[in-house]
């Protein structure tokens, strides 16, 4: 039966948010540590020295340990201002306005075509659309369980450049293809 694309996305969103919320604390901790290791091994994909990330909620993969590691390595880390699109402020610093070179985005579900499904508000799609022409790199982070073979896509949906899970790094466009995790 043909479904309205918005309804189909809503159903997928609900399904994958439930999958994400059901991940236990010990696996979540493992995934956060694996994310740090994969980032360390693949820092050549990171553009510039200023990286924006997010504060996890709703079962999102915990990027706070990664943010701490990036600070330790000398990167400037920023978080988006949810009240003002395209504004970022320093994290663990003076909260000054920052312009990131690389943006780490949360993901509800992703596919092999580098499509991401988020909460449905279009916030990250708008950000990607506005900042990609400026050469910014967009990295989606998720649990491998959030993989969906083919996501429904609308005209406004924006693709990611890289997707990192606890298991591997997937690179799109002109970037090298899938890099397996090394321990």
Where are these regions (language model features)?
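A structured binding-face within diverse protein domains that lines the active/interaction site
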Residues: 89, 106-109
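Charged helix-capping and loop-helix junction motifs
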Residues: 119-125
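Surface-exposed, charge/polar-rich loops and edge strands
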Residues: 1-7, 22, 94, 98-103, ...
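A residue-level signal for conserved active-site and pocket-lining positions in enzyme catalytic cores
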Residues: 16, 53, 77, 104, ...
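Glycine-rich, N-terminal phosphate-binding loop of Rossmann-like dinucleotide-binding domains
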Residues: 55, 107, 167
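N-terminal active-site beta-alpha-beta segment that forms phosphate/nucleotide-binding
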Residues: 2-99
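Short glycine-rich anion-binding loops that position phosphate/pyrophosphate groups of nucleotides
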Residues: 57-59, 108-112
């Amino acid at each position: 039966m043909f479904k309205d694309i918005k309804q189909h996305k809503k159903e997928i969103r609900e399904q994958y948010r439930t999958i994400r919320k059901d991940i236990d604390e010990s696996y979540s901790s493992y995934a956060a540590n694996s994310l740090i290791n994969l980032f360390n091994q693949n820092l050549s994909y990171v553009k510039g020295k200023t990286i924006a990330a997010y504060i996890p909620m709703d079962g999102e993969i915990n990027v706070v340990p990664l943010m701490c590691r990036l600070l330790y390595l000398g990167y400037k880390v920023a978080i988006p201002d949810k009240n003002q699109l395209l504004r970022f402020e320093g994290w663990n610093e003076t909260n000054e306005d920052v312009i990131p070179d690389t943006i780490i985005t949360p993901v509800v579900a992703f596919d092999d075509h580098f499509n991401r499904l988020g909460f449905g508000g279009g916030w990250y799609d708008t950000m990607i659309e506005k900042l990609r022409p400026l050469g910014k790199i967009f990295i989606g982070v998720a649990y491998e369980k959030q993989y969906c073979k083919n996501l429904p896509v609308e005209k406004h949906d924006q693709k990611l450049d890289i997707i990192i899970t606890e298991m591997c790094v997937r690179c799109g466009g002109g970037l090298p293809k899938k890099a397996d995790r090394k321990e």
